[in-house]
């Protein structure tokens, strides 16, 4: 069970970007719709809306479809559900990298690279990356909870369920650690680094691509462990 839990630590680190680098990215984008200014942090509601919308869709639509092909009551196994969530998590990082790459190109074209100002690119372009993280939550977070409930010994079920939530804290620490390393390894020699105070001078897109690469590696490791894991109960 520990390898499955470990895979979710990086997943939680990716999810944490929604509260840190996504907000910074949004602050450096055009946030006005008419006279109304969208707070950059408020876009986290897209993730919440995605979860609210997709949980019933998964249970009422996807599970019956999966069940036809697999013959399993829950459609797919919990490791498979977690794996799908890990894939969408990686996709969110790729989406964020594409948005940031476009934002930097616009900053270059408008001569805003050395000015700490918002770039004329709508914050609405961030929508897909938040939505993809919501999809990832529906699959991986719920899948992890089901996995620990089904696979833990009866006498340790409460402890294992609590342990399953520890990945969120571990992921936040991992994210903070990775971000703290960015100035060390990416700044210097006249370069402001990937994530400077002025994002127009940085390369936040490279950070997102790095997280996507780590997520892809995480998927392969998780798949290797999951294929060798024998479920205690039919999922």
Describe each region flagged by the PLM.
Residues 1-235:
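Hydrophobic transmembrane alpha-helices of multi-pass solute transporters/permeases
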């Amino acid at each position: 069970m520990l390898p499955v839990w470990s895979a979710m630590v990086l997943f939680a680190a990716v999810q944490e970007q929604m509260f840190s680098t996504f907000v910074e990215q949004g602050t450096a984008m055009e946030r006005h719709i008419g006279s109304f200014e969208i707070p950059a942090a408020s876009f986290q509601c897209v993730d919440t809306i995605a979860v609210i919308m997709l949980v019933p869709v998964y249970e009422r639509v996807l599970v019956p479809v999966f069940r036809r092909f697999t013959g399993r009551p829950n459609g797919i196994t919990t490791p498979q559900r977690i794996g799908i969530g890990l894939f969408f998590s990686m996709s969110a990082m790729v989406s964020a990298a594409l948005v940031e790459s476009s934002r930097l190109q616009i900053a270059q074209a408008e001569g805003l690279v050395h000015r700490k100002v918002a770039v004329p690119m709508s914050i609405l372009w961030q929508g897909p990356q938040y939505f993809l993280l919501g999809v990832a939550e529906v699959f991986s977070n719920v899948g992890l909870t089901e996995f620990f409930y089904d696979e833990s010994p009866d006498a340790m079920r409460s402890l294992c369920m609590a342990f399953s939530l520890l990945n969120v804290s571990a992921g936040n620490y991992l994210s903070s650690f990775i971000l703290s390393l960015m100035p060390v390894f990416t700044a210097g020699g006249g370069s402001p680094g990937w994530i400077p105070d002025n994002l127009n001078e940085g390369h936040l897109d490279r950070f997102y691509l790095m997280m996507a690469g780590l997520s892809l590696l995480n998927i392969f490791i998780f798949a290797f462990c999951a294929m060798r894991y024998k479920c205690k109960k039919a999922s």
